[in-house]
Amino acid sequence: MENSEFILEAKNIVKEFDESDGSIHRVLDGVSFGVKHREFLSIIGPSGCGKSTLIRIAAGLETATSGKFFLDGKMVSGTGAERGMVFQKYTLFPWLSVKQNVMFGLESIGYGKDEAEESAYQWLQIVGLDKYASYYPKQLSGGMQQRVAIARALAPQPRVLLMDEPFGALDAQTRSQMQKYLLEVWKNIDITILFVTHDLDEAVFLSDRILTLQANPGKVKEMVTVNVPRPRTEESLFLPEFVTLRKHVEDLIHPVSETKPQEEKFNIINMVGKKNAAK
């Protein structure tokens, strides 16, 4: 493990849940992959593939039934400051100011108040919110709240930033702005990002590689290398390589064999509708 090319590595992750009828539901089935140092790797797959469960196991928020995650060659056990986490839902404490929210994570790992305050302010400068340090979460937009959450996750200087659909609750315009902002932060600091999304464009736009999963149970379908040149802008979405890659990822997640029965169902509905209209 010490000679691995990966900073974060999943080895044969299996996750099972007990159902109310006594049966066992396997969500993840032998998932293995690695994330390289300073890489931006996204996980995408159909509903029920276990992508959020997988990243929660990486964060130490859930335990795998079998299999392990390794960080810098050492087995991951429980949560740790070396892994920052950002969720889809806004997880800021409403009774704390913006600065106090960022300080909270630092003080919880042993920073003194003065040191935590100085570091929090520096990170708020990095995410462009230092002027809002005394504001409370309810006074901020959704995008600004997620920037605070990112600052809080990055302040302890983790080795890896884990992000579970962090922009899923944002409107399209804010989401696009946050994607570009995240790439700018990632470019300028020493951080590796593992990012869960259900959005094809987002996965291709952000990532160096994309891990595609199949569902029921969740298994690795294919690891896709993103050959779209950086830096990426709105114009990147119209590049031939972007369009081709997006189509390839879409076909992996929703194969023709799965979409055809659905198309046949709609054809039957249309035929019945035409017959009824002719009566």
What are these regions (language model features)?
Residues 44-46:
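The feature captures the beta-strand-to-loop junction immediately N-terminal to the Walker
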Residues 59:
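Helix-to-loop junction immediately C-terminal to a conserved catalytic motif
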Residues 67-78:
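Conserved ABC transporter NBD signature motif
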Residues 86, 150:
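Hydrophobic anchor residue at the start of the ABC signature
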Residues 96-104:
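Short coil-to-helix segment of the ABC ATPase nucleotide-binding domain corresponding to the Q-loop/switch region
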Residues 103, 107, 114-132, 184:
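Conserved ABC ATPase "signature" region
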Residues 135-138, 156:
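Conserved signature/switch motifs of ABC ATPase nucleotide-binding domains
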Residues 161-164:
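Catalytic Walker B motif of ABC-type/P-loop ATPase nucleotide-binding domains
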